[in-house]
């Protein structure tokens, strides 16, 4: 499988133990782990434009497939929340109409189908769509994501960056999240004693894709 | 029957005032206190048993431990709970030989008596803290 960049909007490390996750905590001990930093206010479109353009303060472009990261990696886009409905091979409306488990399964199945042919850049928006207004389902959402990542690993995924562009929702306000998200990857973060900045995720994925393609997928 | 001022025992008044001062100070440090060199020593002096979580923004397990510390702070009101960002206050971290993160140090009467390195279940941390409340 080609490398996968999977962003989970609004997920934080805080409830990994509370929600009794199995895959992600084990994965943290096996590959590189770190903290992604993105200060408030954080919005899904602005955050993802930053990743796709590999710039801290990006100018949104009309077509996500023509962004620098996609041109460099030739990646397939899946459910990217730069527009509403999301952009890519799998797409949903950015509201509560798609249940969280439907989205998680849809994204994972699309990744598995696509990553045999090209690198994949994908997003799961469920924590951001549901947890601003209903924190009581957090563990159900987290477990669905945890199971899905286990499914991805079982399907042969070995090169990846799993991250959250920002942390957990902290209020009903759309741009209000913790400033710190997750970073679990098979590529080292740029500096050991520092957080990973949002725009660096794109650069890291380009480097990961180049290193895998130079040695064969 | 209500007592008037003349009947009040000055010793009891003194004790009540001291207790009120102590409670006011503890209220200042309720929840999980963000510690710095400005309040670190005063925080330790305020509580017979105090717990300090040494962390840094780049440390992923530190974020896993944070909600455990917050819950313990709610469940153990007699214990002071604080967090110290080791990037902002490296001198304090060095003073207590904090080499790995997260490190939780339990203080009794202002002195370090125990430490836990890494993320551990809430029960384990709670039991370690309780041991210093009982003796």
Where are these regions (language model features)?
Chain B
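Proteins that catalyze or organize thiol-disulfide redox chemistry
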Residues: 1-51, 57-63, 67-80, 90-91, ...
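Hydrophobic anchor residue in the Rossmann-like NAD(P) cofactor-binding loop of oxidoreductases
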Residues: 86
């Amino acid at each position: 499988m080609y490398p996968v960049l999977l962003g989970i909007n609004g997920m934080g490390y805080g409830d990994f133990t509370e929600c009794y996750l199995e895959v992600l905590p084990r994965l943290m001990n096996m590959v590189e782990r770190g903290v992604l930093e993105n200060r408030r206010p954080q919005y899904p479109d602005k955050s993802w434009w930053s990743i796709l353009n590999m710039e801290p303060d990006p100018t949104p472009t009309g077509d996500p497939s023509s962004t620098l990261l996609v041109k460099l990696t030739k990646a397939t886009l899946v459910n990217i929340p730069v527009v509403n409905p999301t952009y890519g091979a799998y797409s949903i409306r950015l509201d509560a109409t798609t249940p969280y488990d439907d989205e998680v399964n849809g994204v994972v199945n699309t990744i598995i189908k696509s990553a045999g042919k090209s690198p994949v850049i994908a997003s799961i928006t469920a924590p951001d769509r549901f947890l601003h207004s209903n924190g009581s389902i957090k563990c159900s959402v987290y477990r669905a994501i945890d199971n899905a990542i286990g499914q991805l690993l079982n399907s042969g995924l070995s090169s990846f960056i799993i991250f959250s562009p920002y942390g957990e929702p902290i209020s009903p306000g759309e741009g209000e999240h913790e400033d710190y998200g997750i970073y679990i990857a098979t590529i080292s973060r740029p500096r050991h004693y520092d957080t990973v900045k949002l725009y660096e995720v794109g650069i890291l994925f380009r480097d990961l894709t180049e290193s895998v393609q130079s040695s064969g997928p | 029957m209500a007592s008037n001022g003349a009947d009040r025992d000055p010793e009891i008044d003194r004790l009540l005032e001291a207790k009120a001062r102590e409670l006011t100070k503890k209220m200042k440090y309720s929840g999980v206190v963000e510690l710095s060199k400005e309040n670190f020593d005063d925080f330790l002096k305020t509580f017979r048993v105090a717990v300090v979580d040494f962390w840094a923004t780049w440390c992923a397990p530190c974020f896993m431990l944070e909600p455990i510390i917050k819950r313990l702070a709610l469940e153990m009101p007699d214990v002071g709970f604080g967090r110290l960002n080791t990037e902002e206050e490296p001198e304090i971290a060095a003073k207590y030989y904090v080499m790995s993160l997260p490190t939780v140090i339990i203080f009794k009467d202002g002195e370090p008596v125990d430490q836990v390195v890494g993320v551990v279940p809430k029960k384990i941390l709670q039991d370690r803290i309780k041991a210093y409340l009982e003796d």
